[in-house]
């Protein structure tokens, strides 16, 4: 079992968004998944029961920013940052997502931020980062979330260059469980990639960053995500649904095993062309069962894509690449992870990059901007 301690060095990856993304309706919807309602209820109940049993972070009925000591920045984005924070009373550590309201509005991300909060507050699953509470002040929005000390999977993948077949299968199996749960709630994730997959202190997956997640009753037509991981139906603007998550899983499995995504280019336009041309090539060393699954996940016809047909997620679970996976053991975290992050103390940030601290707080916002988050 490999043990790692490193700083993540992720280069910025362009996220693509149509202007209409910011104008999407904020109403909550659900859609009929391929699983029956009884099956969905069983998935949800089992996942939430497991999440509650395994939760180690003390929770409060309410939070106040004054209760938190803000320690250090552990992540930075276009319109916000993530800080490590410590509860002054319990000593528990949290990830504090800090968003500058003016920048959110200027970047036309208002609806995405609302979506992320609404979606995360619904989710209770061992492979999804937990959100505990939200706060705001005159210029910022705050999301108090679970601190995942292992850092990004991206860091470990780049350090290793690629993962073995068994390592890729381990992570893919945990992601399948998370996607099954998310889809059962009528939610599409839309941003699956190594940078959004964190490792817990034990080495298990934690899906993070739900800014592009959306509750969906049928299809949506906006282009949201990262170029390398976009499904062809997203590029064609013919409407997409949960099938984009299964496509992204195929890209992820390929990238884990090869070290780079299957459709590449020097520019975003070239990447799009490669996706549309769909020239899928595998190294000779690529596991045959994994190859078969990736091909079925990267099926251009979304109606024939594995995970999107009558049996839904069960078709993915029943694939021969996963034949040795005990799904109950996977969900209950009884399978030993291939990578265990090196951590020396609670609140250790050694698996994150170093960032310059923000001393300005960013631009001031107007009352009109604040009104967009009146219910925050």
Where are the language model's segments positioned?
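Activation-segment/catalytic-loop signature of the eukaryotic protein kinase fold
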Residues: 134
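Conserved short submotifs of the Hanks-type protein kinase catalytic core
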Residues: 139-152, 156
């Amino acid at each position: 079992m490999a043990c790692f301690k490193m700083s993540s060095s992720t280069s910025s990856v362009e996220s693509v968004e149509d202007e209409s993304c910011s104008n999407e309706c904020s109403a909550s919807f659900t859609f009929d998944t391929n699983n029956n309602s009884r099956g969905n209820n069983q998935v949800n109940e089992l996942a939430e029961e497991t999440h509650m049993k395994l939760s180690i972070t003390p929770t409060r009925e309410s939070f106040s920013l004054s209760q938190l000591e803000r320690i250090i920045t552990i992540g930075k984005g276009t319109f916000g940052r993530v800080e490590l924070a410590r509860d002054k009373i319990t000593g528990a550590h949290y990830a504090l997502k800090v968003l500058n309201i003016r920048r959110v509005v200027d970047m036309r991300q208002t609806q995405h931020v609302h979506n992320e909060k609404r979606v995360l507050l619904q989710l209770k699953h061992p492979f999804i980062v937990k959100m505990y509470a939200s706060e705001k002040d005159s210029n910022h929005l705050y999301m108090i979330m679970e601190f995942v000390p292992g850092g990004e999977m991206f860091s470990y993948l780049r350090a290793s260059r690629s993962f073995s077949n068994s390592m890729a299968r381990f992570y893919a199996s945990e992601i399948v469980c998370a996607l099954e749960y998310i889809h059962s709630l009528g939610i599409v994730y839309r941003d699956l990639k190594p940078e959004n997959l964190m490792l817990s202190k034990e080495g298990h997956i934690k899906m993070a960053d739900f800014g592009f997640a959306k509750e969906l009753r049928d299809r949506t037509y906006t282009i949201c995500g990262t170029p390398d991981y976009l499904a062809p139906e997203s590029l064609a603007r013919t409407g997409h649904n949960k099938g984009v998550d299964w496509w992204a899983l195929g890209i992820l499995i390929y990238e884990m095993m090869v070290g780079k995504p299957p459709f590449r280019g020097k520019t975003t336009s070239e990447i799009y062309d490669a996706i549309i041309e769909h020239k899928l090539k595998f190294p000779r060393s690529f596991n045959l069962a994994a190859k078969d699954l990736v091909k079925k996940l990267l099926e251009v016809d979304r109606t024939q894509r594995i995970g999107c047909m009558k049996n839904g997620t069960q078709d993915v679970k029943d694939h021969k690449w996963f034949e040795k996976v005990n799904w109950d053991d996977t969900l209950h975290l009884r399978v030993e992870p291939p990578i265990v992050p090196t951590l020396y103390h609670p609140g250790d940030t050694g698996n994150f990059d170093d960032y310059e601290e923000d001393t300005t707080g960013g631009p001031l916002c107007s009352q009109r901007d604040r009104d967009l988050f009146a219910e925050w």
